């Protein structure tokens, strides 16, 4: 990722962390990162993997798209590229991504926020995908919907695969309360 993308991503993570009243140490610990690594990411100096960004989204209890919304170019590593196409703002929240996987790629994904599902439609190539214990082969034009709050994966054979991924997050209560610690006082925020 280039410097402007890393800076934007870092600011998004830091803003969400502070809004949720989490310390740098607490978020780093919860996400399984070294505090120094999270600090570098927030400052735009780190180079987080897609899995690291997903873990941070899960720990912040926000959709992945909230962290990468301002990133216009594809994010990628190890033969996988992902680009946010659009974000919904309704309840339940729906985000749409374009994803490309290189030949002979296995992309293992950690569980997302509880209640999340993914619906993937294969555009080109061949793909084996779904929950780890219920993988499905997809033909071009076919869609597979599965629980994404459990370990799941995407696996290609000797060809590239391109797909659309629709992530639907669990419906949220209408009036949720979050607390942000400011000068040892709690401020009630309605979302």
Where are these regions (language model features)?
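Glycine- and acidic-residue-biased ligand/ion/polar-headgroup-sensing regions
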Residues: 115-131
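Ligand-binding loop in jelly-roll beta-barrel domains
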Residues: 148-173
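Short acidic-glycine-tyrosine-enriched beta hairpin
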Residues: 132-149
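Short basic helix-loop element that most often maps to the first helix and adjoining turn
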Residues: 11-28
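Recognition helix of helix-turn-helix/homeodomain-like DNA-binding domains
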Residues: 32-48
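A short glycine-rich, His/Asp/Glu-containing loop-to-beta-strand
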Residues: 76-111, 166-167
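DNA major-groove recognition helix of helix-turn-helix/homeodomain DNA-binding modules
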Residues: 51-66
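Histidine-centered metal-chelating micro-motifs
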Residues: 106-108, 144, 149-153
